[in-house]
Curated annotation (Swiss-Prot):
It holds the Pfam family UreF. Required for maturation of urease via the functional incorporation of the urease nickel metallocenter. Its main location: cytoplasm. It comes from Prochlorococcus marinus (strain MIT 9312). This is Urease accessory protein UreF. Gene3D superfamilies: Urease accessory protein UreF. Keywords: Chaperone, Cytoplasm, Nickel insertion. One of its GO terms (molecular function) is nickel cation binding. It is found in: Cytoplasm.
Length: 228
């Protein structure tokens, strides 16, 4: 088993590398509106986000960031690639519909950059600026030599695991049902990951009006941050 194969488990762990944080991402609003009341509704919500949610755009950015890191590492178009890197990072952060979501992104990114630094891979590209979670995830996968398809699959898996962990605390739905949902999500994660690999960024459709409203209705999302 290769080192990169083992290192990817650091990224998909529900406790690492983001400090044991578990963000609810507006689930309380769905719960308050009675749109989220059992394991089936939780599963349907996560599947919907995987199919048409903004998380798809985040996943696509992973690939763009990864390609940029490769080119910079090869000494190709360093200046223009760095500008593109910063521009895409700023763009994906600004696409988040609430301050809390942007703060979540930057907190998680900082934690992951801290981890990769401990492994000997310090991020040197404007690290004093606010960085997005996709940027940090892509950097970690680039450093750990994880393949692009595994990078995307692991990203979706970790995100869905975080959502299920939050749902387990909010509803609750029970740990056994949570594990069953995660199992059932594997096929859709694999399918969506392959779709993302074959698409250009302009081809990524997402509709997250409901999620945006849920997050904005939940005035202080950061208070719903659970520590494991």
């Amino acid at each position: 088993m290769t080192k990169s194969h083992l290192l990817k488990y650091l990224l998909t762990s529900p406790n690492l590398p983001v400090g044991g944080f578990c963000y609810s991402e507006g689930m309380e609003s769905y719960l308050h509106n009675k749109n989220l009341n059992d394991s089936n509704s939780v599963k349907e919500l996560i599947i919907s986000e995987l199919k048409i949610g903004q998380i798809r755009l985040d996943a696509k950015l992973l690939l763009d960031f990864f390609d940029i890191f490769n080119e910079i590492n090869d000494g190709k178009n360093a200046k223009s690639n760095l500008q593109k890197l910063l521009s895409l990072n700023k763009w994906i952060l600004s696409s988040k519909d609430s301050i809390e979501m942007r703060e979540q992104q930057t907190q998680m990114a900082k934690s992951l950059f801290d981890l990769t630094k401990e492994f000997g891979f310090e991020y040197l590209y404007e690290n004093n600026k606010k960085s997005s979670w996709p940027l940090a995830w892509s950097w970690a996968c680039f450093c750990f030599e994880i393949t692009k398809i595994e990078m995307v699959e692991n990203f979706f898996y970790a995100w869905s695991a975080n959502q299920l962990s939050a749902a387990l605390r909010i509803i609750p739905i029970g740990s056994t049902k949570t594990q069953l949902i995660q199992r059932d999500l594997l096929a859709i994660i694999s399918k969506v990951s392959k779709e993302i690999m074959d698409k250009q960024i302009d081809d990524i459709y997402f509709g997250n009006v409901g999620l945006a409203m849920a997050q904005q209705n939940h005035n202080d999302l950061y208070t719903k941050l659970f520590r494991n």
